[in-house]
Amino acid sequence: AKAFRVNMERIDWKVAALHWTPEFDYPDHVKLLPTSIKVLDEEMGNCGDYLLILYLDKDKLVEIGTKGIMNFPQGYYVYIGSAKRNLEQRIRRHRHLRKKMHWHIDYLRQESEFIGVIPIRTKRDFEHLLAAAISDIADWEIKGFGCTDCSCKSHLFGFYENPLHIKAFTKIEENFEINILNSYFDA
């Protein structure tokens, strides 16, 4: 993205909107959209929010720093986090097990399987909106987890099924990664 931004004046680039289906059928119509350097400048940095997906294969009691021992039922977990800078480094940190414990999620990560992470690159702060949206579809939440600096009830949500296979989850992802860009072009 950075290389593109540096060289974009030398490139004849276009932005297109097309209808897609879950089957990835060939689109019957493509519409060119107005382009905006502002969108690239505001949305392409190494910052933003992320959805970290973990899996626990059985119920576990885990010591979470100063919060003490907490119960985590078997299942999938989605943690909502943010990085005002160094998003890629934060995501890389969550992939690995050996690290200094800093955040609540670091403790749970030591006991869980890494499934994936979904970055949402933006300079806007969607962390709390994401937490609210995910809480609406989650099977349970871990109260007070990862939200000591805000008024959210939680930033960690549990699912019986892999959330990547849940249509409502992928719709939230789509809304925050793609559809949110409509605000730049709506009249």
What are these regions (language model features)?
Residues 48, 75, 104, 113, ...:
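Residues that flank catalytic or metal-binding motifs in active/ligand-binding sites
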Residues 98-103:
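Cytochrome P450 catalytic domain signature, combining two hallmark sequence patches
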Residues 156-164:
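Residue- and microsegment-level detector for short, conserved "hotspots"
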Residues 13-96, 118-125, 163-187:
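GIY-YIG nuclease catalytic motif and its immediate N-terminal context
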Residues 97, 109-110:
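Function-critical acidic carboxylates
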Residues 2-13:
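Extreme N-terminal basic, low-complexity initiation segments
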Residues 111-152:
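Mid-chain, well-packed structural core segment of small domains
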